Amino acid sequence: MRVFLTGATGFLGSSLAAELLRRGHNVRALVRPGSRSRVPPGCDIVHGDALRAETYVDKVAPADTFVHLVGVSHPSPSKAEEFRKIDLVSAREAVNAAKPAGVDHFVYLSVARPAPMMKAYQAVRAEGEAMVIASGIPATFVRPWYVLGPGRSWPRMLQPFYAVARLFPATRAGANRLALVTLEQMTQTLAWAVENRPEQLQIFEPPQIKVGGRLPARSEREAASA
């Protein structure tokens, strides 16, 4: 399968690129000049700006799947303005590049919601999802809350609180929806999504991510009503 990947130099994107290559897929990675060294060997390199579709729109085809992972690193409530300038703009430009290229599957990294914090981040990612849906391209939304990985392990201290929350019916659903996931789980889920295009839309949240996407994906209606 031919995959066009943005965010390939990030900790998640580089892991996914390596896994897709291991599975025998062709990966074309969008990178800024000077960032090539952070992309796994074997990727086809495309130089461009994720915030300007015109810099790479003619280099997307012939891709079957477009995977968009660009976003502000280490999201926090103080980065609301950055979310709109980077996460939202890059999502809009990705859709603008994917549509004319004729890709038949758009995989979008979103965020679990609703949640009691990071409202601006949730809002921007919801807007990104809406743009993907409006494009008409069959899509997969992957919605983690927090991804554990190199330099991202401090939330493990919250695991006892999650365990307690799962004991009570009133808090069980929220604890599952906002569960912590690992880099390996995210990598496997995204790779599974690439290889399993939906007819219209599928959504993976932490319960599905924890098993690498092997639980049935949820529809938009099911996710909204949970």
Regions found by a protein language model. Give the residues of each.
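N-terminal Rossmann NAD(P)H-binding glycine-rich loop of SDR-like oxidoreductase domains
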Residues: 1-23
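NAD(P)-dependent short-chain dehydrogenase/reductase
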Residues: 150-173
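Substrate-positioning beta->alpha
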Residues: 86, 90-93, 156, 177-192
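Alpha-helical substrate-binding/gating segment
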Residues: 164-167, 180-221, 226
